[in-house]
Swiss-Prot record:
UniProt-recorded name of the protein: Dihydroxy-acid dehydratase
Gene3D superfamilies: IlvD/EDD C-terminal domain-like
Function of the molecule: Functions in the biosynthesis of branched-chain amino acids. Catalyzes the dehydration of (2R,3R)-2,3-dihydroxy-3-methylpentanoate (2,3-dihydroxy-3-methylvalerate) into 2-oxo-3-methylpentanoate (2-oxo-3-methylvalerate) and of (2R)-2,3-dihydroxy-3-methylbutanoate (2,3-dihydroxyisovalerate) into 2-oxo-3-methylbutanoate (2-oxoisovalerate), the penultimate precursor to L-isoleucine and L-valine, respectively.
Gene: ilvD
Reactions performed catalytically: (2R)-2,3-dihydroxy-3-methylbutanoate = 3-methyl-2-oxobutanoate + H2O; (2R,3R)-2,3-dihydroxy-3-methylpentanoate = (S)-3-methyl-2-oxopentanoate + H2O
PROSITE patterns: ILVD_EDD_1, ILVD_EDD_2
UniProt key word Amino-acid biosynthesis: yes
Binding site for Mg(2+): 81, 123-124, 491
EC number in record: 4.2.1.9
Length: 616
């Protein structure tokens, strides 16, 4: 029988000092034999996805105490990628993932906590906490802050739905008036919660359901809806049950590595492909798998991408549907149900509810004649009132969207595309692969060939696009923006948004060793590996080189000979210390970022630390 980790600090005469300190936090005699459960919150007033979390940690803590545990809350940092976008702040976004994972490990291990509830929401916070959960392998349950309501405004006498990306695109479009731009800015992000489309934050929160580490509705139930309060309350009760299963019954199936197995990771990427999730999820899933010693690689993602159709299309790939519409259609369980019926899931995997995936689908899939309770749960809709408060409204859709032929979520037979929403491409431009969100690519440019226009930084790319340097038919190359070269692997939301603003969204491609916001769409290919700073061929491309992209064939190539590539490589290596570095890029890189870059791997490895440099 495993001993409570916390016994190290709560038991024995020699721990009198530690117990004295625990008593100063509010613990009493009867508490020292109970599991100490960390409530890992991520409240901050900087991020709309986290601004409403301040009191929710204590909501969970009260439920933990009522269920027989001892709750202790701490906070992690949280970076808002949208606010950090387009300037030096974005260099810090991806590195914050590692910092979050480390900070959770530090707090949990320093204080010998027995289990944890992770209250996450936005882009790097959920993956950072997931990395920590797999690293620590103690009982855990995730509950996110929930998605934002979609924005709505009236333009040209028509009510339109919109989000953050629309504000960015319209702001750079000279044909949009100042008045309309201001109206969009004021309406795009109306409530607390993670941005309303299938961007990175919501994609990751949805994937926690597929991994088995959160409850149904975690990824889709609106932050503002009263129903979400129950997810937090039940998380408090369930974590005590999980802790008791492990520490009192020696049940290792309560641990995250027993739940988030290789089969669960395959289910998660199947879901990601089916729902057209953010390309960042690939980066994060690879990193999370490595933390849990799960054998899951780009090859697995490539294999799954060739089998799984796209069953759901949400903003930014369409403005018709946002996360509130996904929930109305049955949420993530509904997509998993369609994947299961298509024979594309491992349904014997378990979850934090103690159910198999098959049992979960049977109970919660709205397509299977569910209970009135389940129907009511998925009828939760937007309130339409700007607010920063959680659980502030109880509005409901008059009916569920169970149209699997033309609705938000579809069957395999009625899929938006039989070729899924993500694809792995490889060739001499990206020997170790790269990622494209095919859900956001117009059919007319699934095959594309054009001359390269090379930029050594995102800043130069933005200036070049807005300055008219990029023409229809060009392939924009943005390099030295990878994990090591940036450092920090910046998101390229501004370049992709400005291509649209300039009317080039469907007639140009953009390729980078950086990454893309979940809000990006178009022929945007990222995560090129190896990155330029690691000696990747993307660093050898010259202006005018013909670039060939073939998504159906999964290829991406520089149309020059191997001999020419070898000549260019030799010339690069001859530069000595200046080799594989950007030319004439002015960028301040802090000591903290340089330390991150020194250990960072390329995107095909999840941009995690290079363990070989640490003697492993």
């Amino acid at each position: 029988m495993p001993k409570l980790r916390s016994a190290t600090t709560t038991q024995g005469r020699n721990m009198a000092g530690a117990r004295a300190l625990w008593r100063a936090t509010g613990m009493k005699d009867g508490d020292f034999d109970k599991p100490i459960i960390a409530v890992v919150n991520s409240f901050t007033q900087f991020v709309p996805g986290h601004v409403h979390l301040k009191d929710l940690g204590q909501l969970v803590a009260r439920e933990i105490e009522a269920a027989g545990g001892v709750a202790k809350e701490f906070n992690t940092i949280a970076v808002d990628d949208g606010i950090a976008m387009g300037h030096g702040g974005m260099l810090y976004s991806l590195p914050s993932r590692e910092l979050i994972a480390d900070s959770v490990e530090y707090m949990i291990n320093a204080h010998c906590a027995d289990a944890m509830v992770c209250i996450s929401n936005c882009d790097k916070i959920t993956p950072g906490m997931l990395m920590a959960a797999m690293r620590l392998n103690i009982p855990v349950i995730f509950v996110s802050g929930g998605p934002m309501e979609a924005g709505k405004t009236k333009l040209s006498d028509q009510i339109i739905k919109l989000d953050l990306v629309d504000a960015m695109i319209m702001a750079a479009d000279p044909t949009v008036s100042d008045e309309d731009t201001a109206a969009v800015e004021r309406s795009a992000c109306p409530t607390c919660g993670s941005c309303s489309g299938m961007f990175t934050a919501n994609s990751m929160n949805c994937l926690t359901e597929a991994l088995g580490l959160s409850q149904p509705g975690n990824g889709s139930l609106l932050a503002t809806h009263a129903d979400r309060e129950q997810l937090f309350k039940s998380a408090g009760h369930r974590i005590v049950e999980l802790a008791k299963r492990y520490y009192e019954q020696d049940d290792v199936t309560a641990l995250p590595r027993s739940i988030a197995t290789r089969d669960a990771f395959e289910n998660a990427i199947a879901l990601d492909i089916a729902m057209g999730g953010s390309t960042n999820t690939v980066l994060h899933l690879l990193a999370i798998a490595q933390e849990g010693d799960v054998d899951f690689t780009m090859a697995d993602i490539d294999r799954m991408s060739r089998r799984v159709p796209q069953l759901c299309k949400v903003a930014p790939s369409t403005q018709k549907y946002h996360m509130e519409d996904v929930h109305r259609a049955g949420g993530i369980v509904a997509i998993l149900g369609e994947l299961s019926r298509a024979g594309l899931l491992h349904t014997d995997v378990r979850n934090v509810l103690g159910l198999s995936l098959a049992e979960l689908i049977e109970k919660y899939d709205v397509a299977l004649n569910p209970s009135e309770e389940v129907k009511k749960f998925y009828s939760a809709g937007p309130g339409g009132i700007p607010t920063t408060k959680a659980f502030s409204q109880d509005c409901r859709w008059p009916s569920l969207d169970v149209d699997r032929k033309e609705g938000c979520i579809r069957t395999k037979e009625n899929a938006y595309s039989q070729d899924g929403g993500l694809a792995v491409l490889a060739g001499n431009l990206a020997i170790d692969g790269c990622i494209v969100k095919t859900a956001g690519v117009d059919e007319s440019i699934l095959k594309f060939e054009g001359p390269a226009v090379v930029f050594e930084s995102q800043d130069d790319a933005v200036a070049g696009i807005l300055g008219g340097k990029v023409k229809a038919g060009d392939v924009v190359i943005v390099r030295y923006e990878g994990p090591k070269g940036g450092p920090g692997m910046q998101e390229m939301l501004y370049p992709t948004s400005y291509l649209k603003s300039m009317g080039l969204g469907k007639v140009c491609a953009l390729i980078t060793d950086g990454r893309f916001s979940g809000g990006s769409s178009g022929l945007s290919i990222g995560h090129v590996s190896p990155e330029a700073a690691a000696g990747g061929n993307i660093g050898l491309i010259a202006d005018g080189d013909l670039i060939s992209i073939n998504i159906p064939s999964r290829t991406i190539d520089i149309k020059i000979s191997d001999a020419e590539l070898a000549t260019r490589r030799a010339a690069m290596e001859a530069k000595g210390k200046a080799a594989w570095k950007p030319v004439n890029r002015e960028r301040f890189v802090s000591f903290a970022l340089r330390a991150y870059a020194n250990l960072a791997t390329s995107a095909d490895k999840g941009a995690v630390r290079d363990r070989s440099k640490l003697g492993e």
